[in-house]
Amino acid sequence: MKKIYNVYFLCGFATLGGGLFGFDISSMSGVLGTAAYTNYFQVGSGQYKQGSITCAMPFGSLVGALCSSFIADRYSRVRAIQFSSILWIIGSIFMCASNGIPLLVVGRVIAGGCVGIASAMVPVYQAEIAPKEIRGRVISLQQWAITWGILIQYFIQYGASNIDGGPNNPTQSTAAFRIPWGIQIVPGVILFFGMFLFPKSPRWLASKDRWEEALQVLSKLHGQGDVNHPKVLAEYKEIQEALALEREQSATGFQELIKPRIFKRVILGMSLQMWSQLCGMNVMMYYIVYIMQSTGAGSPLLTASIQYILNTALTLPAIIYLDKFGRRPAILIGFFLQAIFLYLEGGLQGGFGAPNPHTDPKLDAISWTVADHPAVGKAIIALSYLFVCSFATTIGPTSWTYPAEIYPAKVRAKAVSLATASNWIWNCLLALFVPPLLWSINWKMYMIFAAFNTAAFIHMFLTAPETKGYTLEEMDDVFDSGLPAWRKLERKSRMEELEKEIIEGNLKITPAHEATGVSATHVTPEKQV
């Protein structure tokens, strides 16, 4: 089957996997406020049942993320993403057909397996096929796709919530939640068939000693099909050298991850994904309807929808400018602003709020309200929007870009799967415990998440160096330089040096890679490989 080699198309289409992640995030938020969902599943007060339903998908995603590297390393990144789409289709069918909480939970766990695999392997595939000049841009497309998935699913649910007289009609049909859960099958089907058009990652091919194929793919991705293009040969040579070094070190698999030079990067990637959850964004996504209800918003579903639009729109600037301004500034600015907005939001909730008198049955899911202070309610809504905007332009894109690019090729899939698993562990815990926390400690929860953002800012300032402008094979130099994280490694690009030598005729790369030898043979007056 004929393959497509346009990097932007490949990276953009692959983010349908991120879109499924977005469908997951808002797969509950739009139905929580409907009578059909509440009456059919009998979630009740206290929210432990709802927390269990919500966290089923993050739990499945955790399992999927942990398994993703085994599938991706053995069968390729492309086949791993394709397999994930099958899980999504099966899980969505179960959700759509659910006749009670048990089948709904099973469906969400299976669909979650898809999201775990896709969320780990889509950024890896993007990082391995994109040139360094646009790597941040194309990987951040993953976050944009997530926001589109959130937005599209939410508005599908918002439209379906008006079936049979609207969300407050006690006799509302179950179509209010079955239609949205059924429609989400469609992108899974598109992703499955679309992946047949994708070439395998050249770095994965090289790791399997399929060097001729790797060179052909590189040439079509970055050299318009010319296997002798200097940029293609330089990248090919750099991959050779990196794999040779890794093989000399002999260790493979997870034991390689505990070596000090790699382990610190594993912890960094896992930490960034952890902080991206503990910053509070997914609370805004999963349970925004409850937050809007506590402010006395006239139409919580409609008011909540604005933040989904902002989330999608404000991710676009990050895609455009991430490769210009860098990852580190985005991370630090993001956590700083998010902390400020949450401290203010928690202060307003605590200073002007009061226990919910439960005079309105539609508001039984919340225990704290500022409805008696309309101006304060509007300020809280505005702060929620500002929080979402700051996340969308900073932490959202970088939390996927940064972990996908900081590891050596030999352990990249495994390390990214652990980083993504960290995301899903905390996602699962938050989905389970936030509803009872909102119920029991209400406004204090905002202060807890604000403190997490403060801690994240300090941690990332001390440990996260800039990665903009380096090839994947140069990340070892960045992290092994001995420089503090706030100082950027100043050095010439190894790939640019190789490209220059090739152009000048001082370095010759033999396109046909013979056997498994990857070392350079020096001759005078030229170098030959």
From Swiss-Prot:
The chain crosses the membrane at residues 7-27, 52-72, 86-106, 109-129, 138-158, 179-199, 272-292, 301-321, 330-350, 375-395, 415-439, 446-464. Keywords: Membrane, Sugar transport, Transmembrane, Transmembrane helix, Transport. It is a multi-pass membrane protein. The keyword Membrane applies. Its main location: membrane. Induction: Expression is induced by the developmental and secondary metabolism regulator veA. One of its GO terms (molecular function) is carbohydrate:proton symporter activity. It is found in: Membrane. GO terms for cellular component: membrane. SUPFAM superfamilies: MFS general substrate transporter (SSF103473). It comes from the Eukaryota. InterPro entries: MFS_dom, MFS_sugar_transport-like, MFS_Sugar_Transporters, MFS_trans_sf, Sugar/inositol_transpt, Sugar_transporter_CS. Belongs to the major facilitator superfamily. Sugar transporter (TC 2.A.1.1) family. Probable MFS glucose transporter; part of the gene cluster 27 that mediates the biosynthesis of asparasone A, a sclerotium-specific anthraquinone pigment important for sclerotial survival. This is MFS glucose transporter mfs1. It comes from Aspergillus flavus (strain ATCC 200026 / FGSC A1120 / IAM 13836 / NRRL 3357 / JCM 12722 / SRRC 167).
